[in-house]
Amino acid sequence: MSVELEKANAVPDYESLRAEVRRIVDEVIRPNAETTDREGRFPRENLQALAETGWNGVLIPERYGGRGLDHVAFAIAAVEVGRGCPSTSLVYVMHVGAVQTIALYGNEDQKERWLRPVGAGAIGTYSTSEKASGGHWWFNFSEASRDGEDYILNAEKSFTTSSGQADFYVFQTRTPGAQTPTDVSFFIVDGGLPGIKPGVWDALGVRGNHSGPITYDGVRVEARDKLGTEGQGREILESGVSPVYLIGLGSTWLGAAQAALEAAVDYVKATIHRDFNKRLSDYQIIRQQLAEVKVLIESLKPWQVSLAKQLDELQAAGRPQVELLLPLVEFKIHAAEVAAKAAKAALDVTGGYGYKKGIFERLFRDTRAGIVMGPSNNIAREWIGKALVGLPLELWYEGGD
């Protein structure tokens, strides 16, 4: 057996990989979390720490300077980063998703130009959502135009993680001459191009991920940075953007849920009521609330690993990853709601002290984002319900859910 084949068939040591990421989180990311939230500071230092150890290129093939790991390793990393700082984890997930989309659909020139700089700390992200289509972020009303061999982009994107901070954007808009809002194409847009105008991000939670509005005002993109072919956006969305985004998003909220539970357990074990000489952990009602959260968190872990392995299997077989769309959406729904429940329980059991500025109220605010991030849990439940009763999802038709 060749060395290359042996390496391809080798199973990564996932616990060693987890420990590697956890060290970065403990040494760099978690200590920055409070400042990231309080000041709304973009977590560039955290992303640089991940880049220096190759984790920003977790899915990038080794021949382009990445680590060439699998979706299981990525999901583990997203959990661990989410445990330390959900803002950083969301930036990380969008970055990994953007570079994976280029790895899957880019040509050799694009991979060389856009993937190699990731090892030095270049940050990518998606730029898709528009206000006019709300939570249906795959619908666009902006439209690219041609100018010779170049493209001119004019769009107002409502939510773009790392807005104004990313080195490049995987940008979605309607194809020139498109007849419907879902005839979309993708472009790789250099973050330093003239005409890119980021707005302000001042939100309830995940305040460091800079998911603000961004305007593209006559941004000129060379034809060589069209990703895939004109009109290929549906395929890219279904099998490039959505799978890695959804497994990463759910993993982020799994990590946030674990952080809330761990902090709450530490607090109730250490806090003593001197009047009755009892720890908070001596009260049955406290233990029951924490136990309920623990059970929910444990229910997510094997599901996460199973989905990540299935993504790897589909990719290895050359099959479209859209086959896992609904299971990934279901995972996203449950992970987001478990995180919100965990943060609420942590706030409940810590009482007035949890309500003060600190990790408990911060996670309470941060975890609300998971429920509304696209596809919002309301929209996602409608997809699942339609599938259950045999109705078409109609994702790509005007008026569809």
Tell where the protein language model's regions lie, with residue ranges.
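Short, contiguous pre-domain boundary segments
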Residues: 1-10
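Generic structural signal for well-ordered, non-transmembrane alpha-helical segments
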Residues: 19, 255, 291-298, 329, ...
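C-terminal helix-coil-helix/basic helical segment that borders enzyme active sites and/or dimer interfaces
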Residues: 30-38, 298-334, 344-355
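Glycine-rich flavin
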Residues: 34, 38-161, 180, 388
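Glycine-rich beta->alpha junctions and the first turn(s) of the following alpha-helix
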Residues: 201-298
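Glycine-rich phosphate/cofactor-binding loops in nucleotide/flavin-utilizing enzymes
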Residues: 352-401
